[in-house]
Swiss-Prot record:
Pathway: Protein modification; lipoprotein biosynthesis (signal peptide cleavage). The gene is lspA. GO terms for molecular function: aspartic-type endopeptidase activity. This is Lipoprotein signal peptidase. It comes from Haemophilus influenzae (strain PittGG). This protein specifically catalyzes the removal of signal peptides from prolipoproteins. The chain crosses the membrane at residues 8-28, 64-84, 99-119, 133-153. It catalyses: Release of signal peptides from bacterial membrane prolipoproteins. Hydrolyzes -Xaa-Yaa-Zaa-|-(S,diacylglyceryl)Cys-, in which Xaa is hydrophobic (preferably Leu), and Yaa (Ala or Ser) and Zaa (Gly or Ala) have small, neutral side chains. The active site is at D120, D138. Signal peptide: none annotated. It is a multi-pass membrane protein. Its EC number is 3.4.23.36. One of its GO terms (cellular component) is plasma membrane.
Length: 171
């Protein structure tokens, strides 16, 4: 009997993908560019266009970066799907991380390929200092990266514990 692979976590990619594109669609339909609605004293919904990557990285270049980011999203997503296929479904943290990164990367890629930019709208600030505006796909990618770090930490801790148990058994 073969064990279930990590591919069963791709539903999480689909959820991140659909929720991101749906929220971007709503923002584009309901907001004018740069329109901002105050939600909390430290949070606005603000429609902006990001022509670069995270934190508008490479946004001021001549347009080649759009193709670079599309290829990068496809390459990373392909690699992570391969990792999911190789993983056992019981590796829940790592599989969830990969799936969230895939969903976020592909959603931003579709937005970039269709529009030539990525729609961002979550705007957190304090006084006059604004954090870079971001979207659901960015959140999915960041949560995925955080889960990978957590998984690596847990795996390293388990290795240390296993070595300690092994040493105790040799005495």
């Amino acid at each position: 009997m073969s064990k279930k692979s990590g591919l069963s976590f791709l539903w999480l990619s689909a959820v991140a993908f659909v929720v991101d594109l749906l929220t971007k669609y709503i923002v584009v339909q309901k907001f004018d560019l740069y329109e901002s609605v105050n939600v909390l004293p430290v949070f606005n919904l603000t429609y902006v266009r990001n022509y670069g990557a995270a934190f508008s990285f490479l946004a001021d270049h001549s347009g080649w970066q759009q193709y670079f980011f599309i290829l990068l999203a496809l390459a990373i997503s392909g690699m992570l799907v391969y990792f999911l296929a190789k993983n056992n479904a019981e590796q829940k943290i790592q599989n969830s991380a990969y799936a969230l990164i895939i969903g976020g990367a592909l959603a931003n890629m579709v937005d970039r390929a269709y529009n030539g930019f990525v729609v961002d709208f979550f705007d957190f600030y304090w006084d006059i200092y604004h954090y870079p505006v971001f979207n659901i796909a960015d959140i999915a990618i960041c949560i995925g990266a955080g889960l990978l770090a957590l998984d690596a930490f847990k795996s390293e801790k388990k290795k240390v514990q296993d070595k300690q148990v092994e040493k105790c058994g040799q005495k």
